[in-house]
Amino acid sequence: MKIKAIYPGTFDPITAGHEDLVKRASNIFESVIVAVAYNTQKHTLFSYDERYDMCRKVLSKYKNVDVIKLDKLTVEHAKELEAKVMLRGLRAVSDFEYEVQLSNLNRAMNPGIESIFLSPDEKYSFISSSIIKDIARHNGELKMFVDDYVEKKLREKVK
């Protein structure tokens, strides 16, 4: 059975943890759609277009991965794109409660979608976009946390 997965997120910026999840998902699913959310609830460092551009650049090496802009509810995009799986990452137990609530809401809105949770590789379990931005603001080492292109964009942005 060929299954398409959608992986939504703000990706402000995309991290090595995000990329690890996409890489692993690309080995499981026929195709993975990375959906960059506008997300009016968050104050982002990077613009919508910049986040989309970084995701496209970083993930271009994965042949069965597409990056789209998410301009409506994820479940609506999933239905239109015939994605059967909503992919979510769980770094810690603290993520679990929110993600289960979101999963139940998504399934209520689109009974054809299932949420699948992947935990990150241990070396990425503590990485978040917020922490990465803080490290960049303090001119810390970013090489192990983000792609070179993202590091360059971060350094330019936080000067």
Regions found by a protein language model. Give the residues of each.
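Nucleotidyltransferase catalytic core that binds NTPs
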Residues: M1-K159
